[in-house]
């Protein structure tokens, strides 16, 4: 099948104008997932190095500095992928005729980012936020992501 042209990539990811069918949305969304998956994997491998206790370790630990430098670059990549996903999904929402395509396209990312933030925050404030309070964020993210996957990846669009 080969790589898409730069014009096709620009159409899919750089603006929310236009329409795409479900097959194009599925392929492009899987491409975004394949692009960010290695970044997530490296982030998970470096996560233990972000725990830094000055009572037990020196002020500067090279692996901790590397882990935080990576997290900064990962945040940049994650935002670019999120913007690309919103633009791609807005095109698909427009194709199936749902109102407010940008708002609906942003909803799954909001739910996933809130769930990730809850997972990050909970261990740091465990005395005031029990572990069970993270689960509603997870449930909301799964429900919204499942609904979005169905609507954009499998629901029929307008006939061409």
Task: Give a label for each model feature.
Residues 1-37, 85-100, 146-160:
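Membrane-interface extramembranous regions at the lipid-water interface
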Residues 35, 104-105, 133:
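Hydrophobic alpha-helical transmembrane segments of integral membrane proteins
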Residues 38-79, 110-144:
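Membrane-helix interface segments in multi-pass membrane proteins
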Residues 78-86:
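Mid-length scaffold segments of soluble, non-membrane domains
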Residues 102-111:
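Central hydrophobic cores of alpha-helical transmembrane segments
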